[in-house]
Structure formats: C-alpha cells, structure tokens
Amino acid sequence: MTSRRRFLQTATAPLATLPFGSVFAQDGADALRKRFQIGIQEYTFHRWIKSGKLDHLDYPALAKDKLGIDHIEYWSRPFGDKNTDKAYVGELAKRSTGEGMTNVLILVDIGDQLDATDAAERLRSVEEHKGWIDCAAQLGCKAIRVNCRSGGDREENLKNMADGLGALCDYAKGSGVKAVIEPHGGNSQDPDWLLAAMKRLDHPNAGLLPDFNNFGDYDRYAAVEKTLPHAVAVCAKALNFKEDGTESNTDFARMLKIVHDSGYSGVVSIEFEGHDIDPIDGALKTKELIWKSLEAAAGVKG
C-alpha cells in the first residue's frame, strides 16, 4: 500500500521542476483572464466599412480570426436602417453567438439627442433609441451607448437628460439591456456631471461607458476612476503608438492599474482610431498593451 508520505512525494514531484512561484503566477494569470475580457469596437474599422472593404455581417468573423477576440461591440452606422429588421439582426446574431462569441454593446449615434432642450426632439430620440434597445436584446448585448451631449446649463441639461434617458431606461426594463452614457461631448465630458446623471436617474438600466481619451480637459485618470463604479464596459481608446509600444496619449499602465484596483470586472474594449497604421495592426498592438498593463497591475506574468 502506498504510504501517505510517498503519495504526496509523487503527486508534487512535477511541481519541483517548475520555477519557484510559477504555479501561483499561472493561477494569477488565469484569474486575470477570467476577470477581464478583451473586446473590440467596430468603429476601429470605420474606414474599411465606409470603403466597402469590410461588410458589417463579416465583422464578427474578422474579430475572431484576425484578432483572436470573441467579445464584440458594434456601431450603429453600419446597420443602416436594418437594426429593426429581425431577419438581418438574426443573421448577425448567428454569425457571432453561433461561433461562441459574446455580443457586448452597440454604440448608437443618431441625430436626435436624449438630452435635447426641445421636448419634441427628446421624444423622437426616445422612440428612435427603442429600436436599438430591441436590436441589442436580440443580439444578446448588455448595453447600448447613448449620447447626452447637448450641453448648456448643467442643471437644466441634467433635467432634460433625466427626462429623455429616463424614459428610455423605463422602456428597457426586462430586456437585459442598459442605456449607458459615454463621455462624448457637452457636459458628458465632465465626470462629475456623469455621476450627477447617475444619481438623478437612479435606474437599474442606466450606466456609464468610461473612455480613456474622451474626457476633454478633465484629468482622464481621475475621470475614469470616478466613473468606473457605474461602468458596464471600459473603452481602451488608442490613437498612436511610440517606438516602445506604449500609447502616445494615455499611459495604459497607469490607467489599467486604476481599472484593476477599482474592482471592476468585465470587458475592456479596444477602440483604435489611428490613421498611420492598419487597423488590424493597431488593434493587435492595443490588445498586447492592455494585457501587458493588466498583468503588471496584478503582479502576474502571462
């Protein structure tokens, strides 16, 4: 009969051949990849879509095959008017979720603003956004990104935002879809205004989409840290890279240390907007930088 001591010696023998700490480091790396998922935003390929080089329905396959990414974010413009076409959206769902991918959110850019000063415009905007809530629900997305960038007097803007976005959030109840504000012009670039918006709405279907590069004159690091508690996803925007692989505008190591230490868990999505290199190359560079930064923040090696 094998003694307990002999069993333990045999069972742990392979570990003795590994560098000290490597087993625990691997556990840490695996845990990091369970906590965070890398996503890709379709706007990364907006020039390809506009030129016809990339068809909207082929985008999920490109993300998986060329980038090794299976968490997908969409942009409203490539849908045209087909976001309410159940067959078309069903085909897109089949090409994504059918391949084991996860649809995350849709960036919705339409003319009428949810926080417009004109009540009739707000009402039109709510009605237009309802179709995007339905589209996101059919795709299995957890959110749509909305714009609240009419600006003007902060308090009046908050009131108008609560009227328009509040009505949309009420519509979204039970859909599994949130309507999230991105810093994208007007008062929405002010993190304190965004926090006031969340407090004013106080709605389970409302949230935020922090963006590394969209807070205007505000300190981007402090702004992201403030807004992370309401984040449904995080937008890791990259524009250009230095020779050492770091991003020219944002210190990714510093920013992703903030994301890591905040307790946030979920998708960190690439949005590459550079013009000097191919979007595939830009997305891959951003992906590498995200993981490298998160690993450094966690003190693990991938």
Predicted region positions:
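Hydrophobic residues in well-ordered beta-strands that form the structural core
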Residues: 40, 103-105, 145, 181, ...
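N-terminal pre-domain/capping segments
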Residues: 2-138, 156, 173, 203, ...
